[in-house]
Amino acid sequence: VHLKPAPIEKPILQREKYDLVIIAYSVWFLSPSQPITAFLQSEQAKILKNTPVITLIGCRNMWLMAQEKMKKMLTALDANLIGNVVKTDQSNAWASFITTPAWMFSGKKRYFSWLPSAGISDADMQDMQHFGRRLVQVLNENQHLDKSLFQNMGAVKIDEKLMMSEKVGHRSFYIWGKLLLKCGQISPAFRQAVLYFYIVFLIILILTVVPLSAVVKRLLKPLLKEKLARQKRYFAEPSGE
């Protein structure tokens, strides 16, 4: 959340310049995962300067705030973000709230027979092929790589109900993350105790604030229609829905 990742082993790059870089990453606490954040903060990441970049995200259901941070890191590196493709969990938010942890702890994507499988569906995985074919076509024809690459291809899908929840959740993660960093400086045991308390708080937050914000947004939707449309267009850039 605070973009202070643990260090990674120095990656070995085969070239000094690339025509295109695809950055695939997962979302941790509404932020880019620590490994990819560590790379983007390394000296090796300077190779992205003036280079077209495509981001590829696989996550449960929330990715907007993570991509905002990714955009800022790429901008700081003078990279050129030309596309973003996102695939999310095949089940709804409430089902995945159960199936995702079950998958993590058991290794079984469908731990509960009465719930959908966790993770991205096979159909969505197959759907990635048409983005690959489009990219191959552009490269083979020596066309210029720009933001039109994946436009009008359904590269991302913005869930209006989650936009407010993401902002609230990210604010919570930021505040608690700052508190946990301070607690760790006092005592690892103290930090662990506060962390356990936060886990309980987080579960309560998900079960209360997320549905409440969705209800509030639905009630206010007629009044916020234009604002929501602008936000959707912004978050969908550069590929669009």
What are these regions (language model features)?
Residues L3-P7, P11-Y25, F29-E241:
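FMN-binding flavodoxin-like domain, especially the glycine-rich phosphate-binding loop
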